[in-house]
């Protein structure tokens, strides 16, 4: 036996692959092992009956299942998350709160604003670039809210002071935010039309977030990126509303 053969790292992955379903975590497990230098024996479970029989044999509830070296109980690592832990890699907590969704929105908005400015003026930003950044951010956030308006309204009603008095406002808010954003992008007189809308929803929103977080000390999730997300209600949420207030005031100041 050569030294290379003796030190060869092998793994066996059982994963569900049928005409109706291909397990994404199985693909990720195979990819992870190959990137770690393993020769992977990729075994497909081609039917529900075959999958159920495999799970019964090994007394497991899910697939994929990863075995390192040989197919024994001692060599079984578990599923994709267990394999990541085995190699010392992090496993995301689906219930953990994170600002990532809203920061991604701000990042994409900045890239769009910079690209538009570069195409029109040869500069990356400038005053108009900042205007476009805020407007694009508002439009993207409104889009995320509108993709599931019911879920958004459920979260929004937890803290917005006006929506708790006038429930229909929770359904109007995303449309108002989107309209203000589009008008700001149009600029000129349309920016002035957008100003009172942005001022109103931004002021109500800023007070609502400030009251819930800093006065009432409530630990809530923010509806800024739509319902069903784990963005914490806090400073980043407040910044969305403060930006709308600033844009509303700026649009009025430009027209004077």
Where are these regions (language model features)?
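Residue-level preference for nonpolar/small residues embedded in alpha-helices
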Residues: 25, 46-47, 148, 214
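Structural alpha/beta surface segment adjacent to cysteine/selenocysteine redox centers
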Residues: 36-39, 52-62, 71-78
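Thioredoxin-like thiol-disulfide oxidoreductase module
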Residues: 43-62, 83-93
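Residue-level "edge-of-site" marker
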Residues: 46, 68, 169
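Non-catalytic, surface beta->alpha helical segment in thiol-disulfide oxidoreductase systems
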Residues: 69-96
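Membrane-interfacial helix-loop segments of redox and metal-homeostasis proteins
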Residues: 101-256
């Amino acid at each position: 036996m050569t030294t290379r053969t003796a030190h060869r790292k092998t793994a066996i992955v059982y994963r569900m692959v049928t005409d109706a379903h291909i397990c994404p975590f199985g693909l990720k497990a195979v990819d992870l092992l190959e990137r770690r230098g393993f020769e992977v024996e990729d075994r497909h479970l081609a039917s529900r009956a075959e999958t159920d029989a495999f799970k019964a044999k090994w007394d497991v509830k899910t697939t994929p299942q990863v075995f390192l070296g040989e197919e024994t109980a001692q060599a079984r690592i578990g599923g994709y998350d267990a394999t990541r832990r085995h190699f010392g890699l992090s496993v995301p907590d689906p219930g953990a709160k994170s600002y990532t969704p809203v920061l991604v929105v701000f990042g994409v908005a900045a890239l769009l604003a910079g690209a538009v400015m570069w195409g029109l003026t040869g500069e990356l930003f400038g005053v108009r670039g900042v205007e476009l950044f805020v407007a694009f951010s508002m439009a993207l956030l409104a889009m995320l809210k509108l993709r599931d308006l019911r879920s958004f309204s459920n979260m929004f009603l937890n803290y917005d002071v006006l929506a708790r008095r006038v429930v229909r406002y929770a359904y109007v808010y995303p449309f108002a935010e989107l309209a203000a954003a589009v008008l700001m992008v149009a600029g000129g007189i349309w920016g002035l039309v957008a100003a009172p809308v942005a001022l109103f929803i931004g002021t109500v929103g800023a007070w609502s977030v400030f009251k819930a977080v800093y006065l009432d000390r409530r630990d809530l999730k923010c509806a800024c990126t739509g319902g069903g997300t784990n963005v914490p209600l806090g400073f980043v949420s407040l910044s969305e509303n403060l930006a709308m207030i600033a844009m509303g005031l700026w649009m009025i100041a430009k027209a004077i």
